[in-house]
Amino acid sequence: MVYIKQIELSHFKSFGGTTSLPLLPEFTVVTGPNGSGKSNILDALLFALGLSSSKGMRADRLPDLVNSTYASRSRSTVETLVTVTFALDDWQPEAEETEEGEGTGLQPGMAEWTVSRKLRVTPSGTYTSTYAMNGEACTLQQLHEQLSRLRIYPEGYNVVLQGDVTNIISMSPRDRRQIIDELAGVAQFDRKIEQAKGKLEAVKEREDRCRIVEQELIEQRDRLAKDREKAQKYQALRQEQATKQSWEAVLRWRAGQRQVQALQRSLAQLATDAATDQQTQQTLEQQIQQTEATLDRLNQRVKALGEEELLKLQAALAQQEAEQRQSQRQQQELVESQTQTQQQIQALLQTQAQLQTEGQQQAEQARTLQTTIAQTLQPQYQQALEQVEAARQSAHALAAQSQDWVTRQTSLRQQADAIAAQVEPQRAEQAQLQERQTQLQQQLEATQSALVTVTAELETETEQAEGDRAALSQAEAAVVTAADQLVRLEEELQIQQETRDRLLKEQRDKQRQLDRQESLRQAMQETQGTAAARLILDTGLPGVHGLVAQLGRVEPRYQLALEVAAGGRLGYLVVDDDGVASAGIELLKQKKAGRITFLPLNRIRAGKQPEIPRWQQPEGLVDLAIALVDCDDRYREVFKFVLGGTVVFERLDQARRYMGQYRIVTLDGELLETSGAMTGGSIARRSGGLSFGSPDSGESAEVRAIRDRLEQLEVILDRSELQILNLQAAIKDAASTLSDRRQQQREQQLTVQQRQQTLQRLQQQQQQLNAELQQRQQQASQAQARLAALALELPAALKQLKTLRQALAELEDSPIHGEWQQRQTLLQQQEALLQQQETALRQAEQQLQQLQTDQKRLQERAIAARTQVSQLRQQQGEQLNRLAQLDEQQRQQATAIAQLQQRQAQLEAQLGQEKVDRDRTERQLQEQRSQRQNLVWQQEKRQQQQQELQQQLTDLEVQLQAEQQELPQPLPDIPEMVQQQGIEALQHELRSLAKRIQAMEPVNMLALEEYERTQARLEELSEKLTTIEAERTELLLRIENFTTLRRRAFMESFEAIDRNFQEIFAHLSDGDGSLQLDNPEDPFSSGLNLIAHPKGKPVRRLASMSGGEKSLTALSFIFALQRYRPSPFYALDEVDSFLDGANVERLARVIRQQAQAAQFIVVSHRRPMIEAAERTIGVTQARGAHTQVLGIPQP
């Protein structure tokens, strides 16, 4: 808990010397006689902490705070020093504070923190005041910054003086509301709003500058647009001229090309003919050669009887037959494979049947065996068991007859059996221990191996668990971050929605205001006649010039005088003639739109104007009214009619001398008629009235402000709606992200839990293996020790057993022993038979179990056989498909073989015609040789013609090559119509274009580039203006959001303080009270009223209460403020002075209750307050000199 631990005063006011006042964190009352210096302790707090000026410490100047006795005795510099020590028990800085690292400031872990202030006063009356923290100098601002960390504020109510209660009572409601403004931090929002408005003004200035530049660029662009249009036309004509000139050159060149092509075609035709003849000749030569070869071949074929072709056909036929055989082999293989598959299926089916049969047989065997066991083996075993029991009883009877022999034999046998019984278990135990030791060694090795494995797994899982826990921490941090983001977005959305709702309400209110103003304006227009004029002007009636007020202009200093002189005639409508006026009157009648006076220019006649010679001008005369109007000459008669012969004087006293001589108006608006009537007094310039230069009843500044605000609200609301939509989308995304992060967190938690379970399981396994290892080691040690003991005990026991058995053998040689031996032999035989029967029974049971196992194995084999049968049948289906393909292939091969065989038969039939063909070929050879001779004669004639055409082609190509170098590259595309019209029409168009181009010159060709540059600058500026507009809208929305936050902060503070006030007032007065705003809808233009309802009295406002009630209400308000923003200490100076005893008791109880959370120092001399205090400090003056303090024991 933070509290004031000590106050040290040196020469402060009534305190002489140095006085230390220790304090405790409790309810302390400072009491004493009037004038003893009680309140000076609180003044010392205000002085040291810089919470008040000298006026607040009841001093005119700071030097008055120095002890007067001390100051009067000393002729040198005097000083006063006050030091306040704070105890910082358990104090920690707020989470949002940043540590500055300064030694003088508050630091975590400090036990105490001191603040001091020294005032030095020189003999001349000048003074210096210095503050210090922990003995180091600081500024007042630095001190207040550190005090604010302790929740001690200059504007707070840590120290409440008598005047503070009175101020609460006497201050205006608006000032009282400003107290809550300070606590709510409204000033901070006001600073933000002002900063935003400053930025908005800067943005507006930038926008205005850009608008000016934009207007200049638009004007420049419009000027350049005309030059650009002419330059574009000129450029198009020049381009068209160049294009058509290129067309002309191309057409000339193409005409030459066509001539070249014609010659080339002729040459080509000759060459083609020559080539054709040559080809024909070559063909004839080839035909001749072929015919000769054919003739030779026919001769040979006739001799050879066509053997070669027949061989080829036979080879092809053999190939087809080989392929057919190959297909048949494949088909055969598939058939065989299919057969094998079918055989495998049959074998498997047989196997299935065999397995089924074997299963049935084994089942039958099992049933038979079960019957044998139940009906034969089990009864035989019971019978043998009964016989063994009978033999044993007979042996016992024989033993009773030969008691001595039996006794001795029994004794020896018992001894031998006892030793054997002792030895045999030991030998068996030794064997078991040896086997056990071997098993334990193996188990130890296995356990150690398993322990190593589990330990390695445990280390791996531990590392993974650490990683999982780190991932879980990250997932939890991500969830917190996503949740904070969602909360921030929702808070911002709520602010935006509140701002939107508030602006919508303001928009509706402004619209209603505008509607009321419009209604008033319309009503005023109707009374002035301008409504009818507006109707005439809006209909576009020809011949209407406008209202008289629109057609003239005057200087502002004469405007009032001339408007008074003109009066209602400013609302007359000027038209061309009386016909237009008649049509306007008819229109008003039809529309029932009221009446108006028309002034036809062809009919209007003004009266005679007074003439005042310049040398006779009266004192104070300004001029004739008509001379002060600036208008078009055609409206001069109109204004003479409107103003009449009115003259303008400066003042009324000057005009009165000429009253009755002229119609006079003064600059202040007094009107003096020639009839003697005088009009004057106070004049109100009504909004909406007609004035010179206004088109109609202009809008008032209030209406324009409302319209501007409505436009601004429309822009801000659009931006706000966009922000709300964006925030809603962002909230949706943030909620989705938060859900995903939470799901990841849950998954990670599940992973960590599973990993923890795995770790626990491995740890348990490790513990079990360790315990098992220890147990095995202990068992091995025990077995080893027991084996060592047996190695010592067994040899002696075996020797004794041998001796006993020899003695027993000698005894058994007697006759009694023979009979005993027979009985024993019979018993052994029957026991052996019993053992055989038992063995047979056990074997039968094992065989039955084996049969059951075999039945299970047969079932598994049957299932496998069924699966294999299914696979083989699938393979069989694939083989059938392949057989069908091979059948189709064999049919095609058979068809090909049949065709080859048919051809072979035809060739064999044709061999008989070979001789006839040979004779026909000889005649053909003679005709071909004759054609070859005619072609030789035609070739010689064509060669001569070709040489003449080649010379013409060479000359024309040289000419075209020179023209081709001047052609544009690539060649332009010439329209089909131009090609059809010909080169003469094109040359005519070129001459016409040349004349048009010459007529347009000169042309500003730079306008093309300048226009584009200007347009680019204008587009860039438009983008910049769009950005500035968005920035301005954003600033407007920010201002509105700050306004929303300011109102929210105020209302939250107001509502909290109101709740505190109601609770505290109920304790102080046994009544109820509340805080009330004059206008809750607009709290910042409202005042704050304290409404109280003391018990048994009607509800009253603060002004109508008694003095005590006012004090209680004001104190309740102060305590409500303190509770809203708590501080570590409070000091009250005689706040109970206006209260009666009962109210002082209630006040003391409230303070004692409040003191549980903060330190209270109360200056009072009222008994109920002193009795309620936990500690009392007395203040007195020693012999009227200095104030002294002392502790008073509590009763």
UniProtKB/Swiss-Prot annotation:
Residues 185-241, 273-348, 380-528, 698-1043 form a coiled coil. Residues 542-658 form the SMC hinge domain. It is found in: Cytoplasm. SMART domains: SMC_hinge (SM00968). CDD domains: ABC_SMC_barmotin. The keyword Methyltransferase does not apply. SUPFAM superfamilies: P-loop containing nucleoside triphosphate hydrolases, Smc hinge domain. ATP binds at residues 33-40. One of its GO terms (molecular function) is DNA binding. GO terms for cellular component: chromosome; cytoplasm. Pfam families: SMC_hinge (PF06470), SMC_N (PF02463). InterPro entries: P-loop_NTPase, RecF/RecN/SMC_N, SMC, SMC_hinge, SMC_hinge_sf, SMC_prok. Keywords: ATP-binding, Coiled coil, Cytoplasm, DNA-binding, Nucleotide-binding. One of its GO terms (biological process) is chromosome segregation. The keyword Cell wall biogenesis/degradation does not apply. Required for chromosome condensation and partitioning. Contains large globular domains required for ATP hydrolysis at each terminus and a third globular domain forming a flexible SMC hinge near the middle of the molecule. These domains are separated by coiled-coil structures. Homodimer. Belongs to the SMC family. This is Chromosome partition protein Smc. It comes from Synechococcus sp. (strain ATCC 27144 / PCC 6301 / SAUG 1402/1) (Anacystis nidulans).
